[in-house]
Amino acid sequence: MKLDYIRNLVEFKRKDGHIHTQYCPHGSKDNMEDYVEEAIKYGLDEMSFTEHLPLPKNFEDPSPLKDSAMEIEKIEKYLKEGQLLQEKYKDKIKINIGVEVDYIEGYEKGIKELLNKYGVFFSDGILSVHMIKGNKGYYCIDFSTEEFQKIIEDLGSLDEVYNKYYDTIIMALESDLGPYKPKRIGHLNLVRKFNKEFPYDYAKYLPKIEKILNIIKEKGYELDFNIAGLRKEGCRELYVEGKVLDMAIEKEIPMVLGSDSHSAKYIKTLKEFL
């Protein structure tokens, strides 16, 4: 049943709903047109560029490389380039110019201000949690195993990292980010990116995850069916997998397949993983 459901996401929608660009500081230098040509090559009918929204004012990027999001000065270039590609390829593929919004606990006002200013220009969007607030500051949960270890040390245990992550997802869902708040939740199990290094049976959190899924269902939101975890040596999992996927299917929560490509070559992984 699960495999049939996943295949339907690809075959009937033929959409990649999670793609980054050269405007992502931690991505490749492949330009937006490279991604478009790859999407056409692999038979997609629709694609969404979802570049990281700039971080809110006065928030210091916790990434050691300070490369979490697009620079605010580049938003107009991103939009203009996307619009040119929409026109150029309008007879071959539908191109959405969207955004991936980082929910950051305590910075809801700043995020809302950014969305109020730029949200009208985006036709697709993802709401994600990449950063969590610890006792000593903020951390990127997906940067490296070394950074992940620092989060464990700050919060006291791996168990508490999972607890904090899912609590932050709930905060993101319930937050008031204005009328342009994205309604698709990104890579729900991103906290498991380094599960090979930090193995953990998160079955105890299934009730909390079910609460998250119930909120998503009640709000009419979607899930980012993100396959990037399969490419990560420390993960080798879908970011919606196992019992979590079972519950999402049972609740009939819409999902949008996403390669989460930071390089054009990963567009093809939509088909390869099947």
Model-derived features: positions:
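An N-terminally biased module of ancient metal coordination in phosphate/nucleic-acid-related enzymes
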Residues: M1-E105, G110-E113, K117, F194-A203, ...
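Conserved, mostly hydrophobic/aromatic
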Residues: H18, A39, G125, H187, ...
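Glycine/Thr-rich phosphate-binding loops of Rossmann-like dinucleotide-binding domains
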Residues: K57, N135, E233
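Active-site-adjacent C-terminal substructures of enzyme catalytic domains
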Residues: K208-K268
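Glycine-rich nucleotide phosphate-binding loop and flanking beta-alpha elements
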Residues: Y23, E105, K133, G229-R231
